[in-house]
């Protein structure tokens, strides 16, 4: 049915749904907006933390982000600039972040949704790790679990800069 126009769907609803987590004036992001919010946040030293609200299907979820201990990683990507490109192949000490979804709790204190329904970021769930370039905050690596494949690591291959 997803390819049909909405007026032909057999099950559709309209109306307001209360967020199970009260936003209390905080913005509610969609999951890919998290990457921008994390990159802009004051997360610099191991132990620095941040909690953000993320919209997930029909509810909101608190996402906990924490800076992990530093560890060098290998990078191999192309920086594309208006005047040309540069190959970056080296060891770097990125800003390593653990990204975890906390259980969704409704106003009555009851856990909502499927207990096995993890927070998901770009198709990855479980123990998600995000590595950002310490200076530019460019995402260098994202790892987590993917259905069928298990542990998956996505690495930056090309970045377009101005």
Where are each of the predicted segments found?
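Acidic, serine/threonine-rich low-complexity disordered tracts
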Residues: 1-8, 48-162
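Hydrophobic alpha-helical segments and helix pairs
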Residues: 1-28
């Amino acid at each position: 049915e997803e390819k049909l126009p909405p007026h032909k769907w057999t099950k559709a609803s309209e109306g307001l749904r209360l967020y199970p987590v009260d936003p209390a004036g905080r913005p509610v992001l969609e999951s890919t907006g998290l990457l921008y919010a994390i990159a802009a946040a004051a997360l610099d030293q191991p132990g620095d933390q941040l909690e953000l609200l993320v919209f997930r299907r029909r509810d909101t979820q608190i996402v906990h982000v924490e800076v992990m201990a530093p560890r060098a990683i290998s990078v191999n990507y192309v920086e594309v600039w208006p005047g040309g490109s540069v190959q970056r192949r080296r060891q770097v000490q990125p800003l390593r972040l653990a990204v975890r979804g906390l259980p969704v709790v409704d106003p009555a204190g009851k856990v909502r949704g499927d207990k096995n329904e993890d927070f998901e970021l770009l198709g990855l769930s479980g123990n998600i790790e995000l590595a950002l370039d310490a200076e530019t905050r460019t995402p260098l690596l994202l790892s987590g679990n993917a259905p069928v494949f298990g542990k998956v690591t996505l690495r930056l291959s090309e970045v377009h800069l101005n």
